[in-house]
């Protein structure tokens, strides 16, 4: 068992299939809610996190209920695979595809986190 002080804590890092680090958060994605539309895990950006992705293009998706939504691509920095997206109409949330990212428990220094 590791000795973690006040300046660090257990977290989970998520990696793109190409091996590039994509996102680090303090809870496992499996403990977060899933969006019913596409089963993506919903990450509230208010959670302590470290984003290792780049923002891509905006695009529109037509939903089965006849509506549409504007998404913003969240891309792997290495291979540019879209591992998650954000919604223009619901800022502050990241929708992560659990089939594309691999989880690894890590220890994170508090000084590296976004506030």
Curated annotation (Swiss-Prot):
Domain of life according to the entry: Eukaryota
Record-level GO BP terms? endoplasmic reticulum to Golgi vesicle-mediated transport
Q: Which GO terms describe its cellular component?
A: endoplasmic reticulum
Q: Which InterPro entries match?
A: STEEP-like (IPR029704)
**Primary role:** May stimulate membrane curvature formation and subsequent endoplasmic reticulum exit site (ERES) establishment.
- What family does this chain come from, according to its entry? Belongs to the STEEP1 family.
Protein name in the entry: ER exit protein
The organism is Schizosaccharomyces pombe (strain 972 / ATCC 24843)
């Amino acid at each position: 068992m590791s000795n973690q002080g006040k300046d660090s804590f257990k977290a989970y890092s998520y990696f793109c299939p190409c091996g590039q680090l994509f996102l680090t958060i303090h809870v496992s994605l499996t403990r977060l809610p899933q969006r019913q539309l596409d089963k993506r895990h919903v990450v509230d950006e208010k959670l302590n996190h470290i984003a290792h992705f780049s923002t891509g293009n905006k695009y529109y998706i037509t939903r089965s209920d006849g509506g549409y939504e504007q998404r913003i691509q969240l891309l792997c920095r290495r291979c540019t695979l879209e591992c998650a997206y954000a919604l223009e109409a619901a800022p502050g949330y990241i929708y992560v595809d659990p089939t594309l990212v691999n989880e690894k428990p890590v220890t994170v220094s508090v000084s590296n986190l976004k506030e």
